[in-house]
């Protein structure tokens, strides 16, 4: 099939590679404009642009995909299908309805659940047993198009946002290729989404990672995993940010008198871990990163920093 691919971040790269490896004709790649980064403000390519350039594929970078001039330029590529994976802009009906097979989107959730941005992280934060990937035929709504194919993935006990991202990226790449095969063969019957079952997730911001120790240890442990590696869960100690990268949940700590502790209080300090009281249960902290320092296991942190029981975190 003659394909135009629209995508921007790392998550989309695997799908572009899979389309190329499957022998489809990628006529053009559409991605977000280059962004200035660092002190030098030098322009940096998106991961998808890097991949396209490596394969000698034409790259288009519209500021606004809705601009009529871009729509008309896109039309000249005569695509059979447009594949959209985390492109980063809403598409007008003039693009959605342009190709013979429409615009096919790869979404990292089991639609209609977890429509919107950041479905991967939220699946971990919410403690979902399963996540997955859905391919759908796009319409003008937010992840509301007809479902084409679905693949479920069971989350591991210590799944992080990063590990699930990698797994679903691989699943999505192969599922999209299967979807293109099915569309071409006429063996796929689109299924309308049940809007009554839909849920939407919010876009994540750095501030969301601030830990509220009044919550249960189980909730906070999932937050830590879901926001690893970005934007990360954090608290404060002596006015410095302390990121917490890995922790376990403990329901009871034998040496702690429950009625004497407050949420956010350090209640035990061992050789390799320390424990924080929460609204319900305790967090046993295994890996941290103090502001201005590298990530390290808690043992290394404790050897370089004097931490005592009774210290209140979050201040």
Which residue stretches match the model-derived regions?
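Donor/substrate-binding cores of folate-linked one-carbon enzymes
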Residues: 22, 32, 81-200, 207
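N-terminal Rossmann-like dinucleotide-binding module
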Residues: 1-40
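Amphipathic, non-transmembrane alpha-helical secondary structure
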Residues: 13, 17-21, 71-75, 93, ...
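N-terminal glycine-/serine-/threonine-rich beta1-alpha1-beta2 phosphate-ribose binding loop
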Residues: 32, 36-78
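A residue-level signal for conserved active-site and pocket-lining positions in enzyme catalytic cores
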Residues: 7, 29, 52, 82, ...
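Internal alpha/beta domain cores that form substrate/cofactor-binding pockets in large enzymes
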Residues: 2-4, 27-28, 58-77, 90-108
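Acyl-group handling in specialized metabolite and lipid biosynthesis
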Residues: 202-215
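An anion-binding loop in the catalytic cleft
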Residues: 213-315
